[in-house]
C-alpha cells in the first residue's frame, strides 16, 4: 500500500501524480517506486532507442456474476541489436518473489540465432526505478551482455563503498544496509529463475544448486518484503554492481507517494 507524502492530502488514487507535491526521500531502498515503475523504466528504455511492442490477450472468466472477458497486456522492449530485452509482465500474472509478483523481467542472449535467454533478472513492484534504470543502462552499454568479466567481490565492494555493511558470517557473499532493512546476497536462486548455463550450478550436498544474486528490502524484522529482485546465475556481476550502486546510493530520490510500511523510516524534504 502506498500513501501520499503530504498528510494533508487523503490517499486517493484518482489524484494525478503530477498534481501532488514532490519530496526528496532517503534512503532510497525504502522509498518505493512512486507508483510509476512501468513508466519510469519504459521511458529510460525509449531514451536508449529500444523498440517497444505491446501484446494484448483476452480470456473468458466465469464466476458467480456470470462470464466476462479479461484483457491482459504485456509490453516488450527490445534493444537495437536484439541481444537484450525487458518485459513488463505484472499484468500477466507472473510468479512471485518474496510474496510479491514480478513486474519487470530483463534478459540477454549471446547471439540472435538463439531463441533462449542466457540469463534473466526479475524485479517486483517497489524496487526503486532508479536502480533498475541503472542496471539497464549498464546492460545497454555492454558490447557482450553475457560475458562474465568480474567476480562477485565487485558487487559487495560497490555496496560497501556507499556505506553498506558486509555480513559478518558471509563477508564475501552478502552485504546489508546499516539499519538491516535491505540486503544483497549471493546464494541459491528461487524456483522459476531462468538461466541457460548448466555450469552455473554449484554442487551442494547431494544435488546441484544454482547460485545468483538476490536483493530485498524488509522494513522490519519479520515484516512483509517491500520489494525483491533476483538475478540468475549467469547475470554478469558488473551489471549487478550497477544495480547495487544505485540501490545503496545515499543520494535522495524524488517521490510523490511512498510505501505505507516505511513512512516512519524515511527522511523527506520538499523538492521546492
Task: Annotate each predicted stretch with a short phrase.
Residues 111-172:
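Surface-exposed beta-loop interaction hotspot
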Residues 146-208:
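Surface-exposed interaction/gating patches
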Residues 216-222, 230-272:
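Long, compositionally biased intrinsically disordered terminal regions
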